[in-house]
């Protein structure tokens, strides 16, 4: 999530001895100076990695606006940059739900698929699949345990300037070790930590094969897509009006058997998630307010609500 481009002189930071994303001066993100395509990935065709992501109160773009979310996600991701395809095997735990499944994205036919509970949902890919990685700037060095790493900040687009992100790369090996995200607004602290395991600088092509349950599935229309993408939505987060503007009532998401279709016609703009299959009791966390489940998700990212930009990688 990005920043207006302000041009002024940058004094480079030498060594970050005790690493904290807040220890990196904001001015590094506010100028184009020093950003370049990392030498390790200039000819990168893709990647594969296992990952674990923990987020607390971190600002994320969603179909309902930019909201703070807290969740844990783990899994596997691989992307073929040249072939414009991505696969994610994910498991997510958040306040009101637990879910897991597989995500497939294909830039060439502009379609994405989510497989959850053996069912498949297809949606139009409403963002361009990137053909290269973003630019980086080295701002220091530190250690993970006793492993020396370089600290690189990520330069992205301007659409959603609410978080800062950096990555830690093992010296001389081009191996991703970790990534850190933090809310730009220091009065509303939020952080995410993303660790990489078994990282490889090449895609696993066998993962891009679409499963048979998706072969005859057609993309849904745009209205249904919005409700499908509301993965992290819960009442406490969506009713935070600060991130929806002064004149927009923050929507609320409930799941009920009596409201099987998305309803956005009432005065309070209450949104109801559409039921797609019989709920699996193991995937539903019940609270006094509502029983919550999700059947799919969107690869919403820290770069833009309309850009993949390799969320799991950077």
Curated annotation (Swiss-Prot):
Keywords: Glycoprotein, Secreted, Signal. Glycans are attached at residues 43, 96, 109, 116-117, 161. Residues 252-314 are annotated as: Disordered. The keyword Signal applies. It comes from the Eukaryota. GO terms for cellular component: extracellular region. Residues 257-268, 285-296 have a biased composition (Low complexity). It is found in: Secreted. The keyword Calcium does not apply. This is Uncharacterized protein DDB_G0292248. The lineage of its organism: Eukaryota, Amoebozoa, Evosea, Eumycetozoa, Dictyostelia.
């Amino acid at each position: 999530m990005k920043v207006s481009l302000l041009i002024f002189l940058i004094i480079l930071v030498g060594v970050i001895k005790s690493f904290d994303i807040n220890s990196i001066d904001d001015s590094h993100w506010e100028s184009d100076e020093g950003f370049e395509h990392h030498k390790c990935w200039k000819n990168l065709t893709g990647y594969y990695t296992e990952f674990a992501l923990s987020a607390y109160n971190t600002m994320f773009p969603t179909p309902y606006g930019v909201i703070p979310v807290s969740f844990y996600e783990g899994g596997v991701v691989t992307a073929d940059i040249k072939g414009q395809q991505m696969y994610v095997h994910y498991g997510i735990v958040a306040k009101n739900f637990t879910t897991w499944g597989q995500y497939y994205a294909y830039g060439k036919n502009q379609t994405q698929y989510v497989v959850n509970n053996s069912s498949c949902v297809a949606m139009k890919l409403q963002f361009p699949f990137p053909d290269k990685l973003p630019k980086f700037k080295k701002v220091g060095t530190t250690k993970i345990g006793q492993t020396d790493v370089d600290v690189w900040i990520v330069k992205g687009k301007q659409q959603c300037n609410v978080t800062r992100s950096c990555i830690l790369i093992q010296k001389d090996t081009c191996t991703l070790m970790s990534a850190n995200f933090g809310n730009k607004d220091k009065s509303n602290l939020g952080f995410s930590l993303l660790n990489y395991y078994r990282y490889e600088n090449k895609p696993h092509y066998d993962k891009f094969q679409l499963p048979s349950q998706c072969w005859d599935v057609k993309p849904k229309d745009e209205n249904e897509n919005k409700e499908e993408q509301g993965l992290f939505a819960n009442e406490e987060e969506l009713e935070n009006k600060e991130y929806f503007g002064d004149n927009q009532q923050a929507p609320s998401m409930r799941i009920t058997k009596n409201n099987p279709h998305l309803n956005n016609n009432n005065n309070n703009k209450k949104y109801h998630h559409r039921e797609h299959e019989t709920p699996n009791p193991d995937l539903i966390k019940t609270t006094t307010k509502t029983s919550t489940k999700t059947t799919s998700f969107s690869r919403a990212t820290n770069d833009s609500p309309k850009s993949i930009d390799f969320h799991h990688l950077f």
